Amino acid sequence: MQNKEYDIAIVGGGIVGLATAFQLQKNFPKLNLVVFEKEKELAFHQTGRNSGVIHSGLYYKTGSFKAKNCVEGRKQLVKFAKENNLNYDICGKIVVAINEEESKRLDQLKINGEQNGLVGLKLLTPEEFQKIEPNVDGVKALWVPESGIIDYKGITNKFADKVKSINSESLIITDCEVKDYKENQIKTSKGIYKSKHIIFCGGLFADRLAAKDKVKLEMQIVGFRGDYYELSEKAKSKINNLVYPVPNPEFPFLGVHFTRMTNGDIECGPNAVFTFKREGYSKTAFNLKDTLQALSFSGTRKLFINHWKFGLNEYNRDFSKSLFLKELQKMIPSLEMHDI
């Protein structure tokens, strides 16, 4: 057992865990913190496997915590990146309607974004948005100038550096899984640590960590995997920045879109398929406990029953490059199979 007692222990070394650690350490420099990350490096799961988009706050219900946190978080994130010379670009994005039904939803999306405090939103005709993205087709688009791209893994590691530079007594421990905790003792794969307080930032295992702490939740995490293709070197010129479809309001997914990464690559995706392993990143990834827990949850069954057709289409696209391409061609008709 470690003899030292820490003021706060944070479980989870993704961007949420390290942002929490950084803010606490910045505001209370004398606090002794310890961060536990079960993988060998920080930002290994969701933080390091997303498309790197800085979302503006366009989609979320006005007045919700999601809307408020997205807008304020974006401002803080950009400020931090600028102050620390980190790689980011507020390049803006267009949301493209491909038919009249989507055009009406796009009008409402603009109103929603303005109510959330976004500035510079502008509806564009095809002639106008093709000056931004010449290869994109559609009936109307929404210009969102406050969206951008960033390296979230780099941000997370910079948070870690800042924590250690403010207080050298604070620790960030990787390859260290939290097994159990009781009162002020935390049992890990690297021994027992003592802490006055514990903050859980456990990503896809947040619900299980809460259950260990005897928190009764009505909700449960159900894993969905998103797969991406990359545009070929030759096809990269067909996209300048970020191009999104108008999202279907029935689902929490934004649809297959195009994203320029900070390294210049162009990603196309993702789809959204139920995964049989929470932290599974391949089509064959499987974990019995994760699968049984997800399928026994009433929310999962309700989702499958109500939206089986959507789910089936996503799985078909998951195993068919031609179907994936067909979805991408709705916005960029000139794309061909060899482009992805």
Positions of the model-derived regions?
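Glycine-rich active-site loop/strand segments that organize a redox cofactor
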Residues: 43-73, 82-88, 274-310
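Helical element adjacent to the flavin cofactor pocket in flavoenzyme catalytic cores
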Residues: 142-197, 201-208
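Flavin-binding catalytic cores
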Residues: 216-218, 235-236, 261-340
